Amino acid sequence: MTIKVLVVDDSALIRNLLGKMIEADSELSLVGMAADAYMAKDMVNQHRPDVITLDIEMPKVDGLTFLDRLMKARPTAVVMISSLTEEGADATFNALALGAVDFIPKPKLDSPQDFNEYQDLILEKIKSAAHAKLKTQRAAPAVVVQPSHKPALSNRVINTQLVAIGASTGGTEAILSLLQQFPAVMPPIVITQHMPPGFTRTFAERLNKLTRLNVKQAEDGERLLPCYVYIAPGDQHLEVIKVGGSFKTRLTQGDKVSGHRPSVDVLFNSVAECAGANTTAAILTGMGKDGADGMALIDEQGGKTFAQGEQSCVVFGMPREAIKRGVIHHVVELPQLADKMLNYLASLKRD
């Protein structure tokens, strides 16, 4: 069975470009192309697509309004096509909160190589979206619990432990849900979420507003502090190194690792090397296997490893791969994951 795809975009150029890319793949079937939400609504009812690529900025009815109505009337896997602006990034994260599975920036195709890379990426995202769990099918997010009900962490734990998190497809909302469950006082947290340049700063700002922690996009060479969360910038690997008695960030433009830059494996490997048994790591929803090798090294060095359970994942690929390797100590659905991690940290020897 081929995957039925509907393209919704007010630009004829983008519609035709995406249409040609989809038609070139034997696993996909282009069932329609719509220039606005009204045409899209009719085509959704007529063709019942498996996946919709949806432009955020459209005339008459914008992409977010259409997405909200779609998710209430006929939940469908949606990949947002996003503009590389601050407003576009904000709208993208709102779309993911409404239930879109994934997003990709609008194409900037200055060379044949750009075209081929973009085609590979959009086709991969469409296929992944077709097999993703929609918001209505996943375990409900946890209700945010007040800090007084969370176990207190010792000063030694706060100042010696590192928390590392990796995610891909579905990760933006999973990370938000997880961080909202954490109290304001935590060891430093480092996160790699697969995301293109131009979106990670807005993502960090969003998390900073919606959680008790101080969240920022990581900069090169900064000292990791308790109560802070550091997000890997798009298109740069985030590593942690130890300088003297302090953990510091290192950003690099090295080759893609496990198919990605930033790579979860790069982050996890670095944390395993410099923090060892003082590492608490979680691998969340995502396509592929990035993070499995790094989790193996964290396990080998004596750190504690967690994986998000299948029922709450948008895509179970990354957690499944790490679980298959036998390097995950606890598999926990997202609503309970923060409590499990906090209980572990609270159980460590007090000062």
From Swiss-Prot:
Catalytic activity from the UniProt record: [protein]-L-glutamate 5-O-methyl ester + H2O = L-glutamyl-[protein] + methanol + H(+); L-glutaminyl-[protein] + H2O = L-glutamyl-[protein] + NH4(+)
Location(s) in or outside the cell: Cytoplasm
EC category name: hydrolase
Residues annotated as catalytic: 168, 194, 290
GO MF term set: phosphorelay response regulator activity; protein-glutamate methylesterase activity; protein-glutamine glutaminase activity
Keywords: Chemotaxis, Cytoplasm, Hydrolase, Phosphoprotein
Biological process annotations from GO: chemotaxis
Domain of life of the source: Bacteria
Region forming the signal peptide: none
Annotated CheB-type methylesterase domain residues: 156-348
CDD domains tied to this protein: CheB_Rec (cd16432), REC_CheB-like (cd17541)
Broad class of where this protein is predominantly found: cytoplasm
Pfam family, one: CheB_methylest
InterPro entries found in the cross-reference section: CheB-like, CheB_C, CheY-like_superfamily, Sig_transdc_resp-reg_Me-estase, Sig_transdc_resp-reg_receiver
Residue ranges occupied by any Response regulatory domain in the UniProt entry: 4-121
Free-text comment on this protein's domains from its UniProt entry: Contains a C-terminal catalytic domain, and an N-terminal region which modulates catalytic activity.
Homology family: Belongs to the CheB family.
NCBIfam families found in the cross-reference section: PRK00742.1, PRK12555.1
UniProt-recorded name of the protein: Protein-glutamate methylesterase/protein-glutamine glutaminase 2
Lineage of origin: Bacteria, Pseudomonadati, Pseudomonadota, Gammaproteobacteria, Alteromonadales
